[in-house]
Amino acid sequence: MKSLLLLVLISICWADHLSDNYTLDHDRAIHIQAENGPHLLVEAEQAKVFSHRGGNVTLPCKFYRDPTAFGSGIHKIRIKWTKLTSDYLKEVDVFVSMGYHKKTYGGYQGRVFLKGGSDSDASLVITDLTLEDYGRYKCEVIEGLEDDTVVVALDLQGVVFPYFPRLGRYNLNFHEAQQACLDQDAVIASFDQLYDAWRGGLDWCNAGWLSDGSVQYPITKPREPCGGQNTVPGVRNYGFWDKDKSRYDVFCFTSNFNGRFYYLIHPTKLTYDEAVQACLNDGAQIAKVGQIFAAWKILGYDRCDAGWLADGSVRYPISRPRRRCSPTEAAVRFVGFPDKKHKLYGVYCFRAYN
């Protein structure tokens, strides 16, 4: 017991001797690090930025370092941008930078770079925006053991529209719904996009898939059997369903296009096959559903002539309601999916700009 007590006393004296040899400055460095917390701060001037398909955008991100912090400036700064999936379960790599080393991933190659406005600027520039670029992006800055992140949302100007194929309503599983939107120059809409469309007046009584795998529908005028007679307006949520087996419609989203949408002046009405050929003869292609909605919503296109579209449907866009032309509201009117051999309609064409 005496030997153990002597060992403890010697250890205490040796520790006191060591503490006398350490400078006050060293003690302060440790004290500041403990009390002041992290020495790397990442911020975004805007939580959300807006653009459109084909445009350019800067996702803001700046970082601030404490130059007095122990170890500051020793490590290279690593900047990493990722995109969050709509269900927030995964992150998709977009861009990584460390010193002179830079790497771009996937479809972002050749379209993204750091703004580089200053040594503390981690803002990311995305050029030639696509519909798939919409979403939330995370900026992460790492220096040694210190790191911080910020999330920036990229919103696109555009229009949400409900869609179902020739087979009729409630015939698409989730994967087919995704492809159906792509076939119409669109992507499957997010909940935020549907919610914004509902706030803008979209009222649709058929449930459709959204990008997060949920099934919902927007009601501005509750009625039976659309949301219930005595209920409040809102986006009705059916929840999450089996993506392979469950079948619903889909809500698609599209944005500006780089081309010309127009109704082809032709001496006669056309069958579907004749309509396709007529657009080709005019140096164009038969238009898609997403293009007629974009022309109507974004450009204010108005035409009171029913015309064929690429999916075999017949529609016409009205931005100025009037007698015999959607008198009650501005809308893209849906005639249906008639027999493709019927020679009763004109055609809407789309000519892309190079």
Swiss-Prot record:
Main location: secreted
Pfam families assigned: V-set, Xlink
UniProt note on tissues of expression: Widely expressed. Weakly expressed in the brain.
Annotated compartments: Secreted, Extracellular space, Extracellular matrix
Any one Gene Ontology molecular-function term assigned to this protein's record: hyaluronic acid binding
Chain ranges of the Link domain: 159-254, 259-351
GO CC annotations, alphabetized: collagen-containing extracellular matrix; extracellular matrix; extracellular region; extracellular space; perineuronal net; synapse
Disulfides per UniProt: 61-139, 181-252, 205-226, 279-349, 304-325
Glycosylation sites: 21, 56
GO biological process terms held by the UniProt record: cell adhesion; central nervous system development; skeletal system development
Signal sequence, renumbered to the chain: none
CDD domains in UniProt: Ig_LP_like, Link_domain_HAPLN_module_1, Link_domain_HAPLN_module_2
Name the record gives this protein: Hyaluronan and proteoglycan link protein 1
Species name: Homo sapiens
